[in-house]
Amino acid sequence: MRRLSRLAGLLAALMLLAGCQREPTLWQQESYVFGTRVQITTADVPENVARPAVAAALADLDRWHVRLHAWRDDSELTRINRALAAGQPVDTDGEVLGLLRQAQDMSARAEGLFNPAIGQLVALWGFHADSFAPVRPEPGALARLLASAPSMADVQFDGLRVSSRNRAVSFDLGGMAKGWALDRVADRLRQAGVKSALINIGGNILALGSKGDTPWKVGLQAPRDNQAMAVIVLHDGEALGTSGDYQRYFELDGVRYCHLIDPRNGSAACQRQAATVLVEPGPDAGLRSDVASKPLFFAPRADIARLAGRFAIRDVLLVEADGHTWLSPAMQPRVQWLQRPQQVDVLTGFAEAPT
């Protein structure tokens, strides 16, 4: 079955939590891109400033949605994938080329646990569709695709030209496009004079300024119900990203399969319910918040601190398949529990949180 961004709706309600010394003037606009709900809320920004700035940002999102779509026939990404599958180099523009270069860098940082070159694997599992059937791939087809080992390391760049040493490379940027877009929307709003806003693209969130006299607050969804399990305060420039098994998934023979495909073995069987990261301000905070949650969704706990460090991240929350929840030392004081899980423990390998 398909679950359409329950988290996004939850965040919309929780970001308006009480606690301000004064009530700010809020203005909000919504849209639907990248297969999910988008909400941009401004605080104490005149509507004649907020409205055109947000409209321009939403227009950019609509354009990126079409250009970066992994299975639309008319998308720029599909055109590139077709050329690579035919063994041909292909020219693109600076915007897409820059994104692909970032994808290669992020994949290397993630030690292959984030691999945007496995679009064929995602399609084989049936997730290149707005709705999908509960069907496992044919084992032989899955084995052949895994043997071809598509990787971002196969991709080469020469000016605006993209080529691949491996015809099995097929780009699917769904694991980074929302975060990449967050950074660009934030830049557009800042340039338009919007100093305080909360940008929510399907649960990937970036805060600008504050909500009146207090920071923005967002809710963190409990993976197995439609309620918030915690609230997290976001300061200016911080970004929050979650990868979970509860948005796009199906169940078959008692096993939950989600759209997050493990690049190591091609499995969609979920070993973890969710991985959440909080990223400090920076020009790529949104991108890192989106990407870093993927390797942390797959990696064993012993590797979490090291992998998070490769993205300069200290704030991590994991929910295991049995609901056991783990937090890094820095994340502990940031989480305000509404429904505290039965088991909560501290992840090892991180530096202690500053006092």
Regions found by a protein language model. Name each.
Residues 2, 11-355:
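Mature catalytic core of soluble alpha/beta enzymes
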